[in-house]
Amino acid sequence: MPSLPAPPAPRLLLGLLLLGSRPASGTGPEPPALPIRSEKEPLPVRGAAGCSFGGKVYALDETWHPDLGEPFGVMRCVLCACEAPQWARRGRGPGRVSCKNIKPQCPTLACRQPRQLPGHCCQTCPQERSNLDPQPAGLVFEYPRDPEHRSYSDRGEPGVGERTRADGHTDFVALLTGPRSQAVARARVSLLRSSLRFSVSYQRLDRPSRVRFTDPTGNILFEHPATPTQDGLVCGVWRAVPRLSVRLLRAEQLRVALVTSTHPSGEVWGPLIWQGALAAETFSAILTLEDPLQRGVGGIALLTLSDTEDSLHFLLLFRGLLGGLAQAPLKLQILHQGQLLRELQANTSAQEPGFAEVLPSLTDQEMDWLELGELQMVLEKAGGPELRISGYITTRQSCDVLQSVLCGADALIPVQTGAAGSASFILLGNGSLIYQVQVVGTGSEVVAMTLETKPQRKNQRTVLCHMAGLQPGGHMAVGMCSGLGARGAHMLLQNELFLNVGTKDFPDGELRGHVTALCYSGHSARYDRLPVPLAGALVLPPVRSQAAGHAWLSLDTHCHLHYEVLLAGLGGSEQGTVTAHLLGPPGMPGPQRLLKGFYGSEAQGVVKDLEPVLLRHLAQGTASLLITTKSSPRGELRGQVHIASQCEAGGLRLASEGVQMPLAPNGEAATSPMLPAGPGPEAPVPAKHGSPGRPRDPNTCFFEGQQRPHGARWAPNYDPLCSLCICQRRTVICDPVVCPPPSCPHPVQALDQCCPVCPEKQRSRDLPSLPNLEPGEGCYFDGDRSWRAAGTRWHPVVPPFGLIKCAVCTCKGATGEVHCEKVQCPRLACAQPVRANPTDCCKQCPVGSGTNAKLGDPMQADGPRGCRFAGQWFPENQSWHPSVPPFGEMSCITCRCGAGVPHCERDDCSPPLSCGSGKESRCCSHCTAQRSSETRTLPELEKEAEHS
């Protein structure tokens, strides 16, 4: 059947305008509830795949049932899909949402009394309740998908990643070779939610230009620029993977290729296959040809140590070694500096080009050589060395980050001091471990820092490395552990080690953290700067918290803030209510930006319209990251943030000529070089057309001879007092300031104000500047990010909609609250009301029509107040079933007008019926009295015969 248009988002669909008051203190308020809200979703990325619907992002080919929110819930009989437009490249570009009514596809039932089961669109017969037949595709109930939305989260229909984890197939590997190259590469990918994180290591290959994913026929599904982070390692993320590509991955039909300048179609390639050995892999090897004349032959090995003995288990995959033979014996040798240590025989076939084996009982010397990367693996056909591949065994290369958050809750004897620690590690190919540890908030001197295993018994700990102490007068420890051994490196990569910090007051440990690998996410700040430690001792006043955390923050070339927060030690009561705020110095009034409210211990995201004041604080090192919980709403953890940039100038960051920006693993320019400070936060970027070397944001606006970044607001030169302009994606929108009627009979017109004010409010403006005001003497309005004097009334400006004349906000000086209300338009009796001015909120009857408003302003009326719902007026105490286009009347929802506010709720149906048969009403089932055919009327018998 033809697709119906996508239903609108719940707020616009229902027309419910949530009004209320929220505190607006000087340290930064929550945004007030406005009749129209600014867009919360991130701006769509050019070329990004997927669809945005109802505040969520869906991958191409993904289907879902739309959720209209309470009290309507999930529309079970409506199926939406994210479809790729015909003109777009396969798997790329924004999709198109198409929704259709699937109720006509329900099968015809033979029973007389079908039932509507919860979570289903189609009715079923009572006797089928225990053995339901499969419904048509799309008719089974699905919870709304919500894998990334955490307000970027963990409820609803399982996302792609959750379904994959349930199947046990999240990690895949590929051996990459080429018929015209001696190069060999190995690709490892992990499917996490709807993103594919990949790392590619290679040998004997010139610098690759791109990593390419294709289907079996060679169609390009995704490409990523290849920027190696170190010798022979490329990292990347494929976000919003289409479902078709996920199916290809699960079916082992997705292929990976490395593209070079000499081989634009791909120099080496291979299919991704699932291997259970990937979960335990801690060592690896890439085997290349020793004969310089051969091509297209190579192999990879996945190795791990046994948990109970010094035995090396491995899986070896190879290609081209059999030389066209269906089956051949192979010989595997383990060498050290050319001397043979071990030798194995194996039989393989062309259908299974690989085998698994065990090297039992490694000696202590062999374990040392394994740690140092000096063991060589050689594979050749038995009976002749004409084809021979070899490579050295090293610790597994990865794009993940080894890190640890140290907190008092994880100490061997938990303590609650407010101290915190943060550690970052780098594992080298020879087994050495470089560490950087930050410790803040301890009440006494740090006396010991050790890397150790989990204690098997009380006071029985195995220490692998004694770390250097803190630098004099600081809170940083930097050094290298060179004696971990092969077993220690194996345990490190298996997330089995802990970092313990002992102090004079707590010699056994005041802080302790689990060393874990953080999956690669594309966040460049992990690799070019240390994380910011978050501690309760840094909160003002200090909080003796047993939790801790650290965070990475960075500004990209468009001055967008990227952040990633990790926490540890939060108790069960705080787990569900955690928020992260970015603000200025503690105790000073100013904007406070909510980064994210989240559940669990980690959060990440991007802020694209950070306030200039906060950008300036970031550049000066006076910005703070504040973590609040349910038990500590004023702050549980805090850390000081410093990001050197020119973003406080209100424009783009411009790199100085001759300065080479270091590259992060994802290929983006890092932000570590210190750049000179720019002009003040309100200064625009002068327009210099044609100047080479200066990157320009395609969303920048050019107005009055100056460039303004996307989201910038300013007063234009032609009317600096009574106009406000905003840049919205290369478009400048200027609105006149509309003054609300003053509440006093004799207002005063100030020279520096556009709107007249009452005399007593004018006197409040004569006080010292607003930044010095106490929180109760003014309000900070997050809509246009400005301070308002007590008693001020104004029409709000909400990006990207601009001036909202249908709402009036008031600053309540006594409480510091911003209270916004929708303008109540009178009910008109004329048939054709008109809007006198395009900017007016309310319509009015035409002049000379001889009709007046039937009702005055409901907010000021003496009689009962009515309710306006979905464009209609309902009298006080009236009940009705709302109508939702294009689905019609919602018979299971009842709305009622009370005190001028509509209240809607779903009808409460009784528990499942115990009677044998029932009667189906518009929403709920109820039992009916059974009557014999003698007592039933003739029309009832005729109707029953028709249904039978």
From Swiss-Prot:
Origin: domain of life: Eukaryota
Entry's transmembrane regions: none
Keywords: Developmental protein, Glycoprotein, Repeat, Secreted, Signal
GO biological process, one term: chordate pharynx development
Signal peptide positions (record): 1-26
GO function term, MF aspect, one: syndecan binding
SMART domains in alphabetical order: CHRD, VWC
Glycan attachment points: 347, 430, 877
One Gene Ontology CC term in the entry: extracellular space
Protein name: Chordin
Source organism: Mus musculus (Mouse)
